[in-house]
């Protein structure tokens, strides 16, 4: 595998915790899911500790930090509570995301351009504890350029509009937006990741984009795991991504 065809898979285990929290039980254990994902080829584990604690809990994050063999990508809102927790936990990677209590899932990208000083301060605090920061943003040139200005080393492009497109023409347009966003981010010296809404039937065109470093995928893998098991679900996704990346 050459550098040009290398692509990483970050497995988001939030929805293993969603199933647990639905009944207030101790199972299924997202930590076990994370370890299974690593054994199946995941390059990292993503968790989002939301303000309302709807799925991942603080204890999950603490345990994962101790047992992961790869690395944790800690998704977090830009709040004092989350910044203080991240400073304590010191995750290898942190991803700043927008967050609203009423949303089912993260619905859009972070408005970096509209709050540059706030984001710059958060990036500095996280970098000071050794965490590589990415910003979850729409594939919008204005937001990509602002991300570079605030000092974030990485961005994660929101692929939701591509994933939700209902007709082929719209999907093609949205894929092109992602492709152009990757090119711009790379030209500015940023590491470019992507994610949101990706599944087994739409991941390949995104994985084939030259310059994408990592895809973060969760819901589709957790759903598929109900039928084939968690390790198999992760392995199948990784295989699709690697096959697509060889076409770059």
Swiss-Prot record:
Keyword Nucleotide-binding: no
Any Gene Ontology CC annotation: cytosol
GO biological process, one term: pyridoxine biosynthetic process
Residues under site feature: Transition state stabilizer: 156
Residues bound to 1-deoxy-D-xylulose 5-phosphate: 14-15, 50, 55, 105
EC number(s) reported in the record: 2.6.99.2
GO molecular function: pyridoxine 5'-phosphate synthase activity
Compartment(s) of residence: Cytoplasm
Biochemical pathway: Cofactor biosynthesis; pyridoxine 5'-phosphate biosynthesis; pyridoxine 5'-phosphate from D-erythrose 4-phosphate: step 5/5
Residues forming the catalytic site: 48 (proton acceptor), 75 (proton acceptor), 196 (proton donor)
Record-listed 3-amino-2-oxopropyl phosphate binding positions: 12, 23, 197, 218-219
Keyword Repeat found: no
Highest taxon in the source lineage: Bacteria
Alphabetic keyword roster: Cytoplasm, Pyridoxine biosynthesis, Transferase
Main location group: cytoplasm
Catalytic activity: 3-amino-2-oxopropyl phosphate + 1-deoxy-D-xylulose 5-phosphate = pyridoxine 5'-phosphate + phosphate + 2 H2O + H(+)
PANTHER family associated with the record: PYRIDOXINE 5'-PHOSPHATE SYNTHASE
Family that this chain belongs to: Belongs to the PNP synthase family.
Complex and partners: Homooctamer; tetramer of dimers.
General function of this protein: Catalyzes the complicated ring closure reaction between the two acyclic compounds 1-deoxy-D-xylulose-5-phosphate (DXP) and 3-amino-2-oxopropyl phosphate (1-amino-acetone-3-phosphate or AAP) to form pyridoxine 5'-phosphate (PNP) and inorganic phosphate.
Name listed for the protein in its UniProt record: Pyridoxine 5'-phosphate synthase
Species the sequence originates in: Pseudomonas aeruginosa (strain LESB58)
